[in-house]
Swiss-Prot record:
Name this polypeptide is given: Transmembrane 9 superfamily member 4
Transmembrane segments: 231-251, 304-324, 327-347, 367-387, 399-419, 454-474, 487-507, 523-543, 555-575
Annotated compartments: Endosome membrane; Golgi apparatus membrane
Species per Swiss-Prot/TrEMBL record: Arabidopsis thaliana
Domain notes: The C-terminal KXD/E motif functions as a Golgi retention signal, certainly through the binding to the COP1 coatomer.
UniProt KW Signal keyword: yes
Pfam families (alphabetical): EMP70 (PF02990)
Keywords: Endosome, Golgi apparatus, Membrane, Signal, Transmembrane, Transmembrane helix
A GO cellular component annotation in the UniProt record: trans-Golgi network
């Protein structure tokens, strides 16, 4: 039983190392001689404003001078929607060409209509040359001041200009341009003969091979962009300082009597009448309802927090450099699988501390709490992608691989973690004895209820990260490159601190109002930032992006719902743990009968 998870874990580590560094491992061997064939791969095409809606290159009626060969791809590349095939253009090392004919094709009326439709939707293509990405638009629409789309003119770019930079025997950079002098008019519904041609120019450069990917990260590191990012951090730090001062004031108020007691040794302090949070010391550690669900949420949240920490560590050491195809998706799948034991251990140990008896059910609930909604969402969205015949639709073989990872690694580690948590012989540490009968909670003002407090708890952490959210969204759901992982790590740390502080403060106010049911409230308040992020999704979609269509809309809101749900669990766990430490601390400082 122990050997199987160990072997599968080693297999996953190998898969991870293979998946996150295909460019590094290949690039070290990419030395060419004059005339060597350097493969050019066509990846995908799609509407520029709908990044999830991409199709195979040859789904459009392009021609090819040779049989199309598919490139074998890693797991992360497939999850990223990459489908690389050999392109019709031949770019030998240091081989210059001038208006070379790649292939010829007579477009039928259906082909012309298809090209005209994609040109109207601003379709672009993406290719890779020696693992360097290049893009270009398929054509253009000439409106000439006319407002009726039936009067527009549609042109297909049939000539590409490749400008390639090299350093000794290595390819350093490639630029592709469409030539406005080579256009094919596709306005009318008639057959058209098209010659797809290209020009190749080689230029020498002093840029070393190790720095050839740096140009893709320069855009996000421009001074005016950095100023915005640093302003975001300063704004967040001010929020943290205000909250820290606010919390310090609360703690001073809470422990004021104890400071007086220890400073002046006055016995009269012990005899004063208990009020507020002291009055409910016999109920504050009464175990909550639905403790199995609470423990499962804490287990899943702990796993997701661990996953986020590892992802940031990999980002800071440079694994997720621009256009390292599929590295992030590979890392997410592998690290999530390997950290499932943390979820099982955390959930089962806490559940048993709360005197739970059905730990098997608790472990199953933990494993399905996040994966269940994710599976349902994926099944729906993958069906949509299949209906659209988009590259986002996962092949059956990839689905089998993911299922095997779940069956052979995720589930066994989850169960082993649950067994370890169950066997952890520790009782819940409660400084005060719980009374036999629960105390009645007095009526609360509207602003002390759950929903208003969730709104307050989510707004402050969200205000600390909302500036950075735009750049993240523009990178994930657009074509902007995000590489400032150090700043993102600082923002994430601030998010964690603010979430913990604001949840502790609201927990104190709840206890001061003699409301002892703080367990679920602290988790809901901590996780409410996820709801604010999802509300930002609505704003971003309608006000800051040009996304459209059923597929792109469903992918955006579907996967963002899963991401925000993950943030809810992770930040809710942080808020609960901070509140638990705070509650234990303040009740240790009083004398409990």
């Amino acid at each position: 039983m122990v050997l199987l998870p160990s072997m599968t874990s080693l297999l996953l580590v190998f898969l991870f190392l293979y998946g996150v560094s295909p460019v590094i491992s290949d690039g070290s061997d990419h030395r060419y001689k004059v005339g060597d064939d350097v493969p050019l791969y066509a990846n995908k095409v799609g509407p520029f404003h709908n990044p999830s809606e991409t199709y195979r290159y040859f789904d459009l009626p392009f021609c090819s001078s040779a049989p199309v060969k598919e490139k074998k791809e890693a797991l992360g590349e497939v999850l990223n929607g990459d489908r690389l095939v050999s392109a019709p253009y031949k770019l030998e090392f240091l081989g210059e060409k001038n208006s070379e004919v790649a292939c010829r094709k007579r477009l039928s009326r259906e082909d012309v209509a298809k090209f005209r439709d994609v040109i109207a939707k601003d379709y672009y293509f993406q290719m890779y040359y020696d693992d360097l990405p290049i893009w270009g638009f398929l054509g253009k629409v000439v409106k000439e001041g006319k407002t009726d789309p039936s009067e527009y003119k549609y042109y297909l770019f049939n000539h590409l200009q490749f400008e390639i930079f090299y350093n000794k025997d290595r390819v350093i950079e490639i630029i592709v341009r469409t030539d406005q002098n080579f256009l094919v008019d596709l306005t009318e519904d008639k057959e058209v003969q098209v010659d797809f041609t290209y020009t190749v120019r080689w230029k020498e450069t002093e840029i070393p091979f190790e720095k050839r990917m740096e140009k893709y990260s320069l855009a996000s590191s421009m001074p005016h962009h950095l100023e915005i990012h640093w302003f975001s951090i300063i704004n967040s730090c001010v929020t943290v300082l205000l909250l820290t001062g606010f919390l310090a004031t609360i703690l001073m108020r809470v422990l004021k009597n104890d400071f007086v007691k220890y400073a002046h040794d006055e016995e009269a302090v012990d005899d004063q009448e208990e009020t507020g949070w002291k009055l409910i010391h016999g109920d504050v550690f009464r175990f909550p309802k639905h403790k199995s669900l609470l423990a499962a949420a804490l287990g899943s949240g702990t796993q997701l927090f661990t996953l986020a920490v590892f992802i940031f560590m990999l980002a800071l050491v440079g694994v997720f450099y621009p256009y390292n195809r599929g590295a992030l998706f590979t890392a997410l799948v592998v690290i999530y699988a390997l950290t499932s034991g943390i979820a099982g251990y955390t959930a089962a140990s806490f559940y048993c501390q709360l005197e739970g008896t059905n730990w098997v059910r608790n472990v199953i609930l933990t494993g399905s709490l996040f994966c269940g909604p994710l599976l349902i969402t994926f099944s729906f969205l993958n069906t949509v992608a299949i209906a659209y015949q988009a590259t986002a639709a996962l092949p059956f073989g990839t689905i089998v691989v993911i299922f095997l990872i779940w069956a052979l690694v995720t589930s066994p580690l989850l169960i082993l973690g649950g067994i370890a948590g169950k066997n952890r012989k520790s009782e819940f540490q409660a400084p005060c004895r719980t009374t036999k009968y629960p105390r009645e909670i007095p009526p609360m003002r509207w602003y002390r209820r759950t929903l208003p407090q969730m709104a307050m708890a989510g707004f402050l952490p969200f205000s600390a990260i909302y500036i950075e959210l735009y750049y993240i969204f523009a990178s994930v759901w657009g074509h902007r490159i995000y590489t400032i992982y150090s700043i993102l790590s600082i923002v994430f740390l601030i998010l964690v601190i603010v979430t913990a502080f604001i949840t502790v403060a609201l927990t104190y106010f709840q206890l001061a109002a003699e409301d002892h049911e703080w367990w679920w409230r602290s988790l809901l308040c901590g996780g409410s930032t996820g709801l604010f992020i999802y509300a930002y999704c609505l704003y971003y979609y309608y006000a800051r992006s040009d996304m459209s269509g059923f597929m792109q809309t469903s992918f955006f809101f579907g996967y963002m719902a899963c991401i925000c749900y993950g943030f809810f669990l992770m930040l809710g766990t942080i808020g609960f743990c901070a509140s638990l430490l705070f509650v234990r601390h303040i009740y240790r400082s009083i004398k409990c009968e």
